[in-house]
């Protein structure tokens, strides 16, 4: 490593990138929550909260970009307050943490990984809902889906997952 950066923390950048991932097995119910939207499905997910893999991965991406741990540290599954909780509460909390540190979401790129349900009819509602939670324009939020081509637990219809990448930028543009 160059002596130039040895022992220094890189805090002077005006952008940061975070990546999040979440996965849940299917369980009894008639819907799944995805991107804050109730999507009818033959089953739900096994989770402590509402099990929204997109919003959980979004929280992890935001927290990771700030170096603030993960969703489990902020909302432990052992805490009964979060039993069945709306994952939008988690996203609003993470957004508050960003704002308190003078950061803002620049854009979100979310991918649901599932064989079913098909999410195309719900994508615009997801984008708009996530944008409201983050206080950004819907154009700053991308939501899409892919399958696992029949491979693994997702391919067997046993669950679903999501990956989210988030770009943060400084609200005031000041380098610290």
Swiss-Prot record:
Which cysteines bridge via disulfide bonds?
none
One Pfam family, please name it.
Answer: YgbB
The reaction(s) catalysed by this protein are: 4-CDP-2-C-methyl-D-erythritol 2-phosphate = 2-C-methyl-D-erythritol 2,4-cyclic diphosphate + CMP
Q: Where does a divalent metal cation bind?
A: 22, 24, 56
Tell me the Gene Ontology biological-process terms attached to this UniProt entry: isopentenyl diphosphate biosynthetic process, methylerythritol 4-phosphate pathway; terpenoid biosynthetic process
Keyword Lyase attached: yes
Question: GO terms for molecular function, please?
Answer: 2-C-methyl-D-erythritol 2,4-cyclodiphosphate synthase activity; metal ion binding
Domain of life of the native organism: Bacteria
- Give a yes or no for keyword Metal-binding in this entry: yes
InterPro entries, alphabetically? Answer: MECDP_synthase (IPR003526), MECDP_synthase_CS (IPR020555), MECDP_synthase_sf (IPR036571)
This protein's cofactor list reads: a divalent metal cation
Task: Give the PROSITE patterns listed for this entry.
Answer: ISPF
Identify the metabolic or biological route this protein is part of: Isoprenoid biosynthesis; isopentenyl diphosphate biosynthesis via DXP pathway; isopentenyl diphosphate from 1-deoxy-D-xylulose 5-phosphate: step 4/6
**EC number(s) in its UniProt entry?**
4.6.1.12
Q: What does the cofactor field's note say?
A: Binds 1 divalent metal cation per subunit.
Q: Spell out the HAMAP family in the cross-references.
A: IspF
Indicate the family of this protein.
Belongs to the IspF family.
The protein's name: 2-C-methyl-D-erythritol 2,4-cyclodiphosphate synthase
The species this protein belongs to is: Xylella fastidiosa (strain Temecula1 / ATCC 700964)
